[in-house]
Every structure is written in C-alpha cells, then in structure tokens.
C-alpha cells in the first residue's frame, strides 16, 4: 500500500512538473485522504491543470500571477480561499469589472461550455496551487455553488 502512495505521488509530481512554471513541490497535497480520495484528487489536479492552460492561463498567466491590474492574480487568492462558490460562478458565467486602480473594464469571459466536472477540476487545481490550500472541490459542490449564481 505504501508503494501505491509513492507511485501516486511520483506520477503526480512528474506530470505536474512537465512544462510547468510552477514548482510541483509547492503544490498543496492534503494528507488526510484515503487512497481512493488521493487518486481522485490527483486526477482532478492533473486534468484541472490541462483545463486551466486551455481556458484561463491566457489572462491569469501560467504562473497564476495575472496581468497588471487587468486580470487578478490567483496566488493566495482570497476569493478562492474565502468564497469558492463565487469563483465557480465566475468561471461558468464570467463577469465585467473595473480593473484595480484604473478606469479600464476587464472581462472574464463566460465558460458555459465547461461541465461541472471540468469546473471542479479547475478549482481543485488553482485552489491548491500558488499558495492556495482549499483541498478537493467535488462536482457536487460545484453543482450547489452554481444553483446560487446569477448569470451576468
């Protein structure tokens, strides 16, 4: 069983480290999961990273640092940490907000084509990268979050 954990961690760090600007050893990995939960968590992290690169990194950057005052950084994000439901709504329905300290408006495009599973995977990835430590975000959680959303 310990060999399974070692293999699982090795696979996670190998895949997460490929072509990444983030040091995989800095990713948060909860230690209170059973073996099945750990496997599911790693799957969500890996798929979430792929989805993040395809859907989010153009604005938020591969490093999660965002872009100037237009696109917020995801590093130690208070929105992710304190209001994961709001983050799920932003991914699904997008928003238009004033940029920090500027007269510019920034647009976060709606990603209505993403399934609840894909949103859960993205949230699990970004929520456990760059200093964030929110743990596993399930599809059921995303479904509950989206019920309370008001599409923009």
Predicted regions, residues:
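Electrostatic cytochrome c docking/interface patches
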Residues: 22-51
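Sec-dependent signal peptide recognition
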Residues: 2-11
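N-terminal hydrophobic targeting signals that begin at the initiator methionine
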Residues: 1-2, 19
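Cys-nucleophile CN-hydrolase/nitrilase-fold catalytic domain and related Cys-dependent amidase chemistry
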Residues: 78
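Sequence/structural segment immediately N-terminal to covalent heme-attachment motifs in c-type
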Residues: 41-67, 81-93
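C-terminal motif of bacterial Sec signal peptides marking the signal peptidase cleavage site
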Residues: 15-17
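Axial heme c-ligation environment in periplasmic c-type cytochrome domains
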Residues: 68-75, 96-150
